[in-house]
Protein backbone atom coordinates (compact mmCIF):
# COMPACT_ATOMS: atom_id res chain seq x y z
CA UNK A 1 0.00 0.00 0.00
CA UNK A 2 2.73 2.46 0.91
CA UNK A 3 5.27 1.64 -1.80
CA UNK A 4 8.64 3.12 -0.86
CA UNK A 5 7.00 5.54 1.55
CA UNK A 6 6.75 4.58 5.21
CA UNK A 7 3.55 4.26 7.17
CA UNK A 8 2.82 6.64 10.00
CA UNK A 9 0.31 7.05 12.79
CA UNK A 10 -0.80 10.26 14.48
CA UNK A 11 -3.34 11.13 17.16
CA UNK A 12 -5.23 14.41 16.80
CA UNK A 13 -7.59 16.69 18.69
CA UNK A 14 -9.40 19.57 17.01
CA UNK A 15 -10.92 22.47 18.96
CA UNK A 16 -13.37 25.19 17.96
CA UNK A 17 -16.86 24.83 16.54
CA UNK A 18 -16.42 21.18 15.60
CA UNK A 19 -19.43 19.43 17.14
CA UNK A 20 -22.90 19.56 15.60
CA UNK A 21 -21.43 20.55 12.21
CA UNK A 22 -20.86 17.06 10.70
CA UNK A 23 -17.11 17.30 11.43
CA UNK A 24 -16.76 13.56 12.12
CA UNK A 25 -18.55 12.61 8.90
CA UNK A 26 -16.43 14.95 6.79
CA UNK A 27 -13.25 13.75 8.53
CA UNK A 28 -14.18 10.15 7.76
CA UNK A 29 -14.87 11.02 4.10
CA UNK A 30 -11.58 12.90 3.72
CA UNK A 31 -9.60 10.11 5.41
CA UNK A 32 -11.19 7.48 3.16
CA UNK A 33 -10.52 9.64 0.08
CA UNK A 34 -6.86 9.70 1.11
CA UNK A 35 -6.80 5.93 1.73
CA UNK A 36 -6.23 6.25 5.48
CA UNK A 37 -7.48 4.12 8.36
CA UNK A 38 -8.26 5.06 11.96
CA UNK A 39 -11.12 6.66 13.85
CA UNK A 40 -12.76 9.92 14.92
CA UNK A 41 -15.08 10.78 17.84
CA UNK A 42 -16.59 13.69 19.76
CA UNK A 43 -15.27 14.29 23.27
CA UNK A 44 -17.22 15.35 26.34
CA UNK A 45 -15.34 18.67 26.40
CA UNK A 46 -16.46 19.84 22.95
CA UNK A 47 -13.53 18.75 20.80
CA UNK A 48 -13.11 16.07 18.16
CA UNK A 49 -10.29 13.57 18.53
CA UNK A 50 -9.03 10.55 16.70
CA UNK A 51 -6.19 8.67 15.10
CA UNK A 52 -5.10 8.41 11.48
CA UNK A 53 -2.74 5.87 9.92
CA UNK A 54 -1.41 5.34 6.42
CA UNK A 55 1.30 6.53 4.04
CA UNK A 56 3.12 9.48 5.62
CA UNK A 57 2.35 11.96 2.82
CA UNK A 58 -1.37 11.13 3.00
CA UNK A 59 -1.45 11.46 6.79
CA UNK A 60 0.17 14.89 6.40
CA UNK A 61 -2.55 15.86 3.91
CA UNK A 62 -5.20 14.97 6.49
CA UNK A 63 -3.32 16.97 9.13
CA UNK A 64 -3.49 20.06 6.87
CA UNK A 65 -7.19 19.42 6.23
CA UNK A 66 -7.84 19.14 9.99
CA UNK A 67 -5.90 22.38 10.63
CA UNK A 68 -7.44 24.53 7.90
CA UNK A 69 -10.56 23.09 6.28
CA UNK A 70 -12.80 20.71 8.27
CA UNK A 71 -16.51 20.53 7.55
CA UNK A 72 -18.21 23.47 5.78
CA UNK A 73 -19.84 24.86 8.95
CA UNK A 74 -16.94 24.19 11.32
CA UNK A 75 -14.69 26.89 12.74
CA UNK A 76 -11.35 25.38 13.71
CA UNK A 77 -9.46 27.26 16.41
CA UNK A 78 -6.73 24.69 17.03
CA UNK A 79 -5.58 21.28 15.82
CA UNK A 80 -3.11 19.39 18.00
CA UNK A 81 -1.17 16.34 16.83
CA UNK A 82 0.52 13.92 19.23
CA UNK A 83 2.14 10.48 19.18
CA UNK A 84 3.31 10.96 15.60
CA UNK A 85 5.38 7.90 14.72
CA UNK A 86 6.41 5.50 11.99
CA UNK A 87 4.62 2.16 12.12
CA UNK A 88 5.42 -1.19 10.51
CA UNK A 89 1.78 -2.10 9.79
CA UNK A 90 -1.67 -0.53 9.96
CA UNK A 91 -3.53 -1.17 13.22
CA UNK A 92 -7.02 -0.52 11.77
CA UNK A 93 -8.83 -1.86 8.70
CA UNK A 94 -11.13 1.11 8.02
CA UNK A 95 -11.76 4.69 9.14
CA UNK A 96 -14.62 4.67 11.63
CA UNK A 97 -16.77 7.17 13.47
CA UNK A 98 -16.81 6.18 17.13
CA UNK A 99 -19.60 7.14 19.51
UniProtKB/Swiss-Prot annotation:
Tissue expression per record: Organ-common type isozyme is found in many different tissues.
Gene3D superfamilies assigned: 3.30.70.100
Active site (catalytic residues): 24, 42
GO molecular function, one term: acylphosphatase activity
All residue ranges annotated as the Acylphosphatase-like domain in the record: 9-99
N-acetylalanine PTM positions: 2
Protein name as catalogued: Acylphosphatase-1
Organism of origin: Gallus gallus (Chicken)
Reaction catalysis annotation: an acyl phosphate + H2O = a carboxylate + phosphate + H(+)
Membrane-spanning ranges: none
EC id: 3.6.1.7
Domain of life, per lineage: Eukaryota
Family the entry assigns: Belongs to the acylphosphatase family.
Amino acid sequence: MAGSEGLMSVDYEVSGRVQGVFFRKYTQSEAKRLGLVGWVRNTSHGTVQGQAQGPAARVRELQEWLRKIGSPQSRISRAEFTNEKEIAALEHTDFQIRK
